[in-house]
């Protein structure tokens, strides 16, 4: 055994052993408890970042710990390989996205392997390979035939730079999340998943997810957005509009119906188009509205604008004529693209009415009173008692809801209705590097799904896109085909699927990744699913996690899986953050400098007071800690850390820096501290092993000092078992091991019994660290005399008897101040403890001349004497 800790050698040997033994390849073992641990698979961007290291280390620690509990553990890995970055890189480097992607996968796989992850690489999936997306296309055709997928024209967010449609969530402040381009609204034919058909179940089954963070469940509840309200119809006729009909609106506040003073419609609404026919000003305004974002968040914050149409509708209960306005804050895809405006009790309507001098009529008595003067107050939106509402005066919200419904039903102008904020999922993307949509367009037969025996529709991999829309639409060799129904010439669909589709079912494919008879092999899926522990960032709370839950229910209804939910437990790991440093240039731009290129000056208390660039010695500004990102140049290359310190040091630091659900702040000194700790473990083990391994520990003959050491060993086991097994608090488990190391380093090694006790301590340290620092643990376990590898060892078992103390040291306080301590038998009664405290020499000095009023005994901890 080397005298010095040599991580490179140790880690290479451990990884070679695991590879040769196929240590992490698993198969179904009926009767053995399974555990499926999965971290969200990476996009093959080119190289790992510290966020990856943290994510995959957390999953690996959990996987290895569960294996030590005797479970059959599956931890797979794969690649979320389709997407725009590959196309962008391809254009920049004039290389096909496939080549760029596969090269990145090869490099990143070698990086992941160097971390020593307990991954079953035999189950690796790559979503851009036909053997994967074939089954996605197969499911698409099944769902299309059932009507769960359908095609319709939709108003979409069009990114003019990326030449593709973006989901609402991909539009940030009116701009594309990737390109930064101003988004336009367009009407184009698209394919949609009917996720709204599952809205109720997606909402209700959140209650089953007891292992999910409440924050994530709340975000999903809000996104699904179930609301009970009323559909109200405002009649119009030939005199007022030129045709007869009703304007439908949905409102969650029917109690305020008598306060409606105008109605507002979306730019795409039929009445807007009707009014704009001979109105150039309105035509221009509608065009402006259509150029804006269709994301609700953007609509909520933008300036409210509108134009009157000159059209009028009737109030359904009073017959009063209400003007129709086109307003930019009304969305066509929410409700019916129209709102009844009640300025007195809705903030948007209030703002709009005051801007355009429209009437404001208060109809609810709120905590602010009976009138609602500007500026807006939150109280105006409260529920309350109805006023100025005729026959409905005096009713509360619930009473008004029911009474309004009765009145509207009588006139056949309304009824209660449940509505969801959730929209159907548009998955068509006008880009190349994605899964082809398996539909053939035939003039005679319409949209025809590609037959199963013609799947997969293979994406040509030798294409270099140029950024002008999808190259597939310019490739007759791809889109020209014959109709499977009638045999006539037809055209293949050239749109590809949203890449969120691939990541919505990959976890299920891992159960049987090589199965050629279907999307999953049912027996394997039932054996492994649902995933026991899923790990990933909270930024995926809505999109990915909601889509995966939806897909699981689709697969269940197709008979592919048996469970209702894909992930039993969810851990949302925090970000890795680091200091930022910058200079503001003369033109106002920021230049960011990597922490490795900056030298810090500290005061006497080690607080950073200034920073300078090493290259030129000139000052730089300290920008505070932010998420590691290319944009702030504050990332640390994991590979350089692994090369310098070893994977175990990186893993240890990442798990010690903070609890997994909190942000972890990168610290060079913290990494060095983790490395020093592993060197201490190695040094103690090396010294112990060099003397020869001791015989068996005789627990019955331990002296008092040895009992204290053994108590520390089992206290560490108890605390670490709780922290790792129940709370995923790896940082406190590591702290417990460090405390134990302090005890072991000071322990006597004079006798065989002393050395046997240190042996138990070192074995415990090795086992407790095994999930976190597996390489050094692999080596130490072998050197400590074990023939079987540490990956096959069990988690250490707590000996409760070792925690029993014969005597306790109790603190004595007089009037809350420390005045002494006493050693008492652990079984001492309260009376015996109090008597000993009163008799303590130092205590007698401090209560001299005082009357003892009360004695408080906290068992096993302290005695407080209250005297005056």
Swiss-Prot record:
A motif ('KMSKS' region) lies at residues 627-631. It catalyses: tRNA(Leu) + L-leucine + ATP = L-leucyl-tRNA(Leu) + AMP + diphosphate. GO terms for cellular component: cytosol. InterPro entries: aa-tRNA-synth_I_CS (IPR001412), aa-tRNA-synth_Ia (IPR002300), Leu-tRNA-ligase (IPR002302), Leu_tRNA-synth_edit (IPR025709), M/V/L/I-tRNA-synth_anticd-bd (IPR013155), Methionyl/Leucyl_tRNA_Synth (IPR015413), Rossmann-like_a/b/a_fold (IPR014729), tRNAsynth_Ia_anticodon-bd (IPR009080). Keywords: Aminoacyl-tRNA synthetase, ATP-binding, Cytoplasm, Ligase, Nucleotide-binding, Protein biosynthesis. It holds the Pfam family Anticodon_1. A motif ('HIGH' region) lies at residues 42-52. PROSITE patterns: AA_TRNA_LIGASE_I. Belongs to the class-I aminoacyl-tRNA synthetase family. This is Leucine--tRNA ligase. It comes from Pseudomonas fluorescens (strain Pf0-1).
